[in-house]
Amino acid sequence: MRRSFWISMLSASLFLGSTAQAARPAGPGSPDALDEAAAGRFAQLALACLHQEYPNKISHVMQGDADVRPPRALTPAFYGCYDWHSAVHGHWLLVRLLRRFPEAPFAKEARAALALSLTPQNIAGEVEYLGHEKRASFERPYGLAWLLQLSAELRGWNDPQAKQWAAALTPLESLAASKLKDWLPKLHYPIRIGEHDQTAFSFGLIWDWARVAGDAGMTALLTDATARFYRGDRDCPLGYEPSGQDFLSPCLAEADFMRRVLAADDFAKWLQAFLPGIPSTGGNEWLPPGVVTDRTDPKLAHIDGLNLSRAWMLEGIAHGLKPADKRVPALLAAAASHRATALPAVTGEHYEGGHWLGTFAVYLTSQAGRE
């Protein structure tokens, strides 16, 4: 089922009076509030595709004829929503919304969809597939990071079914974490692109999981990577962004990750050197939203995701600064303009965006990554 919806423009003035430590959440009924109605619309986007097998873009290396199988046989839990990582974060979307709206009209259908996917048998199939020695780089780091986010969301939900799903997912969670831990010490350079392989965004997701899971080893590896890759960075060329099919900002994603790792004073100093062009006079003109020319093109439609992720990254960066920092108004004003541009594009009209943009909308409107 494909359902479209329209979310009206939000005035930047809503944000300019906010503090950095907690950008003012939208109130009930405001245009971009994550209320029950909006949650229902976002949930329907995931429900429409979680078990829709085709069209499907698999990232599948075949070793022989026996590997020629349909997606549902290769990865029996996460075979819908066009690709593996979108299927994974579509499940995350439902879990996050169910935690906030457990009695909503969509709740029964969402629980049924999760129960259909997150069975021990299905997860065993996922472990078998991902554990193959020739698939060391499968969905690394983006898809694996989202898998850990799904696990973190389930871990934080005090619900009997959620506990069952979390237990079923544990072997795959452990495998994903192990693969990332094996990779991180060998990664000699950061990956600074605007698509899936980018390290900064995935590092943020993994960092947040490690805090929930209490995985000090993962936190230590990421802290070491921070020192090697990002601590000395200066003058990030934000003016060169975006590339034509970005859905993540290399500069903003790095800053949004670093505010997780550094203390507020250290982050403020680092940010001044890294993005010296953030105005101290307010306004949103310094970073206009990206322009989408064709939402039926799966790559060009990435810019809708860029606008969504920029919005939450800008809010996250502001959240990492002290309330009196003069850069906060400009950060939140730019976030507001990106919200206003991006949220109306989150519809099911075109599957090219409908299969994944709902997750980005929920990540933004639920203030994920800032708990």
Predicted segments with their positions:
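Long, repeat-rich segments with strong aromatic
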Residues: 213-352, 356
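Extended ligand-binding groove/face enriched in aromatic
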Residues: 88, 97-210
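Solvent-exposed loop and edge beta-strand segments that line ligand/cofactor-binding
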Residues: 27, 31-36, 71-88, 128-145, ...
